[in-house]
Amino acid sequence: MPLTVKCPICKTPVEWAPQSEFKPFCSERCKLIDLADWASEKHAIPVKSEFDLDALDEFDLDEDAFFKE
């Protein structure tokens, strides 16, 4: 018996099987709605910034002098 999951967009039951063309979505419409949400940044994967902007102040960099050279 195949696994049944809910479509992340409309919550319609979707059979998780090779013949389910749009899994985990129920249709191309729901798949495209999800893609649009990612493209418009409604969804995002949380990440911690690699740069500490406060740490840059420790160097007391003079940007004007740097860009004149």
Swiss-Prot record:
Task: List the SUPFAM superfamilies.
Answer: Glucocorticoid receptor-like (DNA-binding domain)
User: Which Gene Ontology MF annotations are present?
Assistant: DNA topoisomerase type II (double strand cut, ATP-hydrolyzing) inhibitor activity; zinc ion binding
Keyword set, alphabetical order: Metal-binding, Zinc
The processes (GO biological process) annotated in the record are: regulation of DNA-templated transcription
Keyword set includes Cytoplasm:
no
| Cell wall biogenesis/degradation among keywords | no
Summary of the function given for this chain in its UniProt record: Inhibits all the catalytic activities of DNA gyrase by preventing its interaction with DNA. Acts by binding directly to the C-terminal domain of GyrB, which probably disrupts DNA binding by the gyrase.
- Cite the NCBIfam families for this sequence: PRK00418.1 (NF001638)
- What quaternary arrangement does the UniProt entry report? Interacts with GyrB.
Report the sequence similarity comment from the record. Belongs to the DNA gyrase inhibitor YacG family.
Q: What is this protein called?
A: DNA gyrase inhibitor YacG
Q: Which organism is it from?
A: Shewanella sp. (strain W3-18-1)
